[in-house]
Amino acid sequence: MANLAGRRMMAEIDGDFVVFLIGARFNSFHLLKTVLDLGGRRGMKHMLDYLVAHPEKGLLGYQMGLPTIVQYWRSFDHLEAFANDAGDPHVAVWRNYWRRVGTSARTGIWHETYLVRAGEYEAIYGNMPPFGLGQAGRWFR
């Protein structure tokens, strides 16, 4: 591991961008059913792998977490196009989620979307490797 002691870094992205928070709430303790509700190997990880392989879709980067994933997008238009294009994996994953879960309340899902205007944010990191916006954008001292 690199020596990160005393290291202060910042991050920036050129132009406006979108921060997309998405997560799940486990309302049941049936772990296997919950993982299956969220799509298993054909769920979020599958979509993120697809987006990384297709940078023209507009995903700038993401940070995995439980239960929340932070995604950075070039624009809301890019995010919305991905969400609604039947040729991209989201539409099928979304339909399959509702088919599996239906009216069951085992697993809840949510998202929040924020438009960030160029220069109207701050991203500072202490004793950290590139993380969050620092992975999606430019990392500097």
Which residue ranges define each predicted feature?
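Tryptophan-centric aromatic hotspots in well-structured domains and transmembrane helices
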Residues: Y72-R74
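Short S/T/G/P-rich N-terminal loop/turn motif that feeds into the first structured element of a domain
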Residues: M1-G65, A81, A105-R141
